[in-house]
Amino acid sequence: MIFSILEHILTHISFSVISIVLTIYFLTLLVNLDEIIGFFDSSDKGIVITFFGITGLLFTRWIYSGHFPLSNLYESLIFLSWAFSIIHMVSYFNKKKKNHLNAITAPSAIFIQGFATSGLLNKMPQSAILVPALQSQWLMMHVSMMILGYGALLCGSLLSMALLVITFRKVGPTFLQKNIKKKFLLTELFSFDVFYSINEKNAILLQQNINFSFSRNYYRYQLIEQLDYWSFRIISLGFIFLTVGILSGAVWANETWGSYWNWDPKETWAFITWTIFAIYLHIKTNRNVRSINSAIVASIGFILIWICYFGVNLLGIGLHSYGSFTSN
């Protein structure tokens, strides 16, 4: 009873804190609050509090249930939210390199944890006895590696999708460009002396516009490079986790079902996902290929991860159906 109450408290604390953090992030986009009262640093500390809250939640559920909390969809979602918190912690303590990971990790963590605690999963939040197939030491190794891999790959893929949005976003003419265009049209109505005077002002405006455009394009280029830098490294880490998870799952399957690979729906989609991200990493090894191409592949991988993660749970078929929506 005590553990159940503690779990309930930690769930609400972590969700409340991360909700406040996300609100602060949105406010800093609208108003420059970080220079006024240092809200941005406070939001980072909020994610740290959330990390420890989710960690306490997982440990409490572990002690309460008597097994590692990865036996159903609810527990795996909480663990996935914890994985996003870990990624944010890495960016928080790596302050030498400014990055925008928090813009991805915070909304992702609150969305996943919000879905897990929304009541849509029926009785899954209640701890239950493990089915015989899950009563193995391989549970911790296999499922934790897969979820960590999903978290890292999702985060890296979202960064790649942000790269595509920034790259293909059409930037409209600036106020200076519009102003210059109007002034050039007005010069046709005046004499030569006035024309010379106005064009001298236009030259100053044009120089200001060039400097502004150069500065804007420079920071845009820097942001694209930073997104590509972090997406590659996070996806590489996620690919390692996914590989270890698939291999450990194959060994576990051989011990349980007598075969390393059964082409179960989840196994098939995991293999497809692994192949897509292997293609991504192969593309990144070629420096002559633009980062846009690899970002497109990562975006495809983002969709495949959700199919692999939720597909079997929605259908409730195959050897991995014990964590589905239909099983209670």
Swiss-Prot record:
Keyword Transmembrane helix in record:
yes
Q: Which GO terms describe its molecular function?
A: heme binding
Thylakoid: present as a keyword of the record? yes
Name where it mostly resides.
plastid
Keyword field? Chloroplast, Cytochrome c-type biogenesis, Membrane, Plastid, Thylakoid, Transmembrane, Transmembrane helix
Mind telling me which InterPro entries this protein's record contains?
Cyt_c_assembly, Cyt_c_biogenesis_CcsA, Cyt_c_biogenesis_CcsA/CcmC
Where are the disulfide bridges? none
Assembly mode: May interact with Ccs1.
Q: What is this protein called?
A: Cytochrome c biogenesis protein CcsA
Gene that encodes it? ccsA
